[in-house]
A protein has these predicted regions:
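Bacterial N-terminal signal peptides that target proteins for export
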Residues: 1-9
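N-terminal secretory/targeting leader peptides
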Residues: 23-115, 124-127, 131-329
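Hydrophobic helical h-region of N-terminal Sec-dependent signal peptides
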Residues: 10-15
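N-terminal signal peptide c-region/cleavage motif recognized by signal peptidases
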Residues: 17-19
Length: 329
């Protein structure tokens, strides 16, 4: 009888252990991009790889921008558990702390995506982002980027002087201040409203996304003077989730998420870069589109204007000062 009871006890323990190991997790993330956008497709491919890598134990439902909350409300939604996570431009939360704007797009800091990734993964950026996010109830998993973004304009732009008086859509934070310092008039709009705003003349130009996506979305039909390669922006796109839900994940699933985001980042940059090269050839063959390429001197002039704003932003909060010191050390 004692032997039978002991066997039953061992079996129960094994069953309990197995059920813990086999526990499934289902998460809901909201993207900053609309469905049908190339960025969104790349993000969806990442969620599919996560499910495959985890043997089906971790599933992520990815929703397009605006599905649950507005694009600039996802940080609160994730922190409060309304969403489990988000994939978004960090600069949208500059109103919470100017540090978000500085780390999101320190114009002039990165010449290529790999430089940003080195900073995030090995240069203190990961720790900085989590120090910024954790008070809001988020865990920063990792970063991706679109690479150097294109710039769409209804007016010819061949240098910094042409920015004067230009009504330009730009994200909140440092990038708006840089454009203002260059003489432009920044306008705060979500990406989903850029086409209509250009078409109706609400804005003259837009810091939008990469050249190929702008072209696919029809922006070059209403803004026939794009600047490419971009001179202005390489956004830090964060993949973050609710801190409590992150802590509830087993360590192997945490590692799958962390490593998979690094792969996702390389995937995004490579795919979008290839798309840009193909689309550039199409655009230059279109007689209705004039692609402008700024000289090295004009690009350097814009970078100097941008870097002058770093210290001003750094003075606005302790966190911003920490970001500034890490960037410049």
């Amino acid at each position: 009888m004692k032997v039978t009871f002991f066997k039953m006890f061992i079996a129960a323990c094994m069953l309990s252990s197995t059920s813990v190991v086999a526990q499934d997790f289902e998460l809901t993330f909201q993207s900053v991009d609309p469905a049908g956008n190339p960025n969104f497709a790349i993000q969806q491919a990442w969620t599919e790889r996560v499910k495959l890598m985890s043997g089906g134990r971790l599933s992520i439902e990815l929703l397009p921008v605006g599905s649950v909350v507005e694009y600039n409300e996802t940080q609160d939604a994730v922190g409060n558990g309304i969403l489990d996570g988000h994939i978004t431009d960090v600069s949208y939360f500059s109103g919470k702390d100017p540090a978000f704007g500085l780390i999101a797009n320190p114009i002039g800091a990165w010449a290529a995506p790999d430089e940003m990734f080195r900073f995030i993964n090995y240069g203190g950026g990961y720790e900085l982002m989590n120090a910024l996010e954790e008070p809001y109830g988020l865990h920063f998993i990792g970063a991706t980027t679109t690479g150097l973004e294109g710039f769409v304009s209804k007016r010819p732009l061949d240098g910094v002087d042409d920015l004067k008086g230009l009504k330009v859509r730009a994200p909140e934070g440092l990038i708006q201040e840089v454009f203002a310092a260059a003489g432009a008039v920044p306008v705060n709009l979500p990406y989903s409203e850029v086409y209509t705003a250009l078409d109706k003349g609400v804005i003259d130009a837009a810091d939008s996304t990469v050249f190929s996506t702008n072209h696919q979305q029809g922006l070059h039909k209403v803004a026939e003077h794009p600047v490419y390669p971009g001179f202005h922006s390489m956004p830090l796109v964060e993949v973050s989730m609710n801190l409590d839900k992150w802590n509830a994940l087993p360590s192997d699933l945490q590692e799958i998420l962390t490593v998979s985001v690094r792969d996702f980042a390389q995937d995004a940059v490579a795919i979008l870069s290839m798309n840009d090269l193909k689309t550039y050839a199409e655009a230059t063959a279109d007689p209705n589109i004039t692609v402008h390429n700024w000289s090295a001197e004009e690009r350097a002039k814009f970078r100097r204007i941008a870097m002058d704003q770093w210290a001003k932003v750094a003075a606005r909060s302790d966190n911003a000062q920490n970001v500034y010191e890490t960037l410049t050390s």
